[in-house]
Amino acid sequence: HSVYPDAITIAEEVSGMPGLAAPIEDGGFGFDYRLSMNIPDFWTKLITDHPDEEWSPGAIWYELTNRREDEKTISYAESHDQALVGDKTLISRRADADMYWHMSRSSRTLITDRAIALDKLIRLATATTMNGGYLNFMGNEFGHPEWIDFPREGNGWSYHYARRQWSLADNADLLYHDLQEFDRAMVRFIDSVKAFHSLPIEQYHIH
């Protein structure tokens, strides 16, 4: 910050070391934010190991708000860890092959509708419980169906999957378009509320 006063610094760290995003004058490291890396891992495990009708609201609340109040954090539902080859995005874990064959308005299925609804719920819960900022990863905001795979020896140095198909989100006949519109409306709402990122978050009741 002494070199670039307007720079934004974000710490990517998994041990939970205190003080990373605390001011230097308070004994911290001075980062502006730290990534809430527990959140995407939690969502992945929850979707993989538990049917959604068994999800615990209390466990979800705890994981989304498990942080130090004096450190600003960046909340996110998923990132490159889930989108790279060998893994699956959250929506792909629910929709699976239907992501390729039933994402048009004329061929939608209960599987795709349920996967889309859960994906929206996950992102809304993650974004609205943030304490600093919310992060999207390229393409995840509209449920991109393919993984990312950069050119390497194992894929013959192919660029085929080193891409995002933005045209899917631009096509109003596809449900990818609806996902992007939801994400856009959610982010605009958050941005419209003054100091949303620092509003107090309280749990009143969990049924």
Enumerate the language-model features and the residues they cover:
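Conserved alpha/beta catalytic core and glycan-binding cleft of carbohydrate-active enzymes
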Residues: H1-A162, D191-H207
